[in-house]
Each structure stands twice: as structure tokens, then as C-alpha cells.
Design a protein with these regions (language model features):
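Short acidic, flexible loop segments centered on an aromatic residue
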Residues: 63-82
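Short, solvent-exposed loop/turn segments enriched in Ser/Thr/Gly
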Residues: 48-55
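Asparagine-centered strand-capping/turn motif at beta-strand->loop junctions
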Residues: 56-62
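Bacterial N-terminal signal peptides that target proteins for export
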Residues: 1-7
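C-terminal motif of bacterial Sec signal peptides marking the signal peptidase cleavage site
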Residues: 15-18
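Bacterial signal peptide processing site
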Residues: 20-23
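Beta-sandwich strand segments
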Residues: 84, 140-150
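Short, solvent-exposed, Trp/other aromatic-anchored flexible loops in extracytoplasmic proteins
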Residues: 87-142, 156-158
Length: 160
């Protein structure tokens, strides 16, 4: 009897979860407080290094809690389709992000960037310098990744 009750409870829970409409994150997530620029990654092998960086928050604009919310940040040069670095960020656990709530600020930097012996400002002004863009993707629970934003990286240095 207890076993049958437990089975019925699990089936009811599974049905109620799977019947909730999926949130279209391209509309259900607002990317807020966005800033981009070139992070001073210090000196590597005797050369100055700059990497593209983004700081952002996600705001839940839907009417549902978004459990296990994640972001994938993809860096690309504006002249190429090839990925130039990426990073995966877990924003919430099973507690989710409540409707109207905002995640803490996230700062993500590419692993790849530019190195040179010039000053950082001279590197940004170099004729060989290629600008970067950043694409943000989000997913929650077992949904598919959806693009929620794309940003160009201005030629500004982010101070530490």
C-alpha cells in the first residue's frame, strides 16, 4: 500500500513538472548590467596580454522559476565564425531563479587574446588588432541552449 502511494506520488510529480510550458529564454531572460572590454591579463612570457571580457546578470522576465539556470559565453573575432574561447557558468542550482529575480553579477574572460611587447593602449590601436564579439546562450533544466545576447567588445581596457 505504501509502495503504491509512493509510486503514485512520483508519477504525479513527474507529470506536473513535464506539463509546465517551456520558457522561451530569448524572451524570458533579460541580460542586464552588461559591460564588455579588454581585461589586462598581466604579463605572459614577457609580453602584455589582453583578453576579451564580459560582466552581466540574468533577470528572469518569465512567470516561472528557472531551475538549474546556466550560461555559455562564446568569444569570437568579428571577422571569423570560429570560436575564440568559451566558458560555461552555472548560475543557479535546483532552487532556480524566481520570476523577477536577478542573478549575481558574473564576469567571464576568454582564455585566448592578444599578446605583445607594446603598451596595452598601443596594442588596442595596432592596425593588426581584430575586434571581438561575445555571444551569450542560456538554458535551464533540460531545455536546449538559446541565444540571449550578442555584444561587441569596445577597445577599452578593464581596470583590475
Amino acid at each position: 500500500m505504501v509502495r503504491a502511494s509512493l509510486c503514485a506520488l512520483f508519477v504525479a510529480a513527474a507529470l506536473s513538472t513535464s506539463c509546465a510550458p517551456k520558457v522561451d529564454l530569448s524572451k524570458g531572460i533579460q541580460v542586464v548590467d552588461v559591460s564588455t572590454g579588454w581585461w589586462d591579463a598581466g604579463v605572459v612570457d614577457g609580453q602584455n596580454k589582453l583578453v576579451p571580457s564580459i560582466t552581466f546578470k540574468f533577470k528572469n522576465a518569465s512567470d516561472q522559476a528557472l531551475d538549474v539556470l546556466q550560461a555559455n559565453v562564446v568569444f569570437r573575432r568579428v571577422t571569423e565564425d570560429k570560436e575564440w574561447g568559451s566558458s560555461f557558468v552555472k548560475l543557479t542550482g535546483t532552487e532556480g531563479l524566481a520570476p523577477g529575480a536577478t542573478t549575481p553579477s558574473q564576469t567571464v574572460k576568454s582564455q585566448l587574446g592578444y599578446t605583445g611587447t607594446e603598451s596595452r593602449q598601443q596594442m588596442l590601436a595596432n592596425s593588426q588588432f581584430v575586434d571581438a564579439k561575445i555571444q551569450l546562450f542560456a538554458k535551464y533544466s533540460n531545455t536546449q541552449w538559446q541565444k540571449v545576447g550578442e555584444y561587441t567588445v569596445p577597445r577599452t581596457i578593464i581596470e583590475k
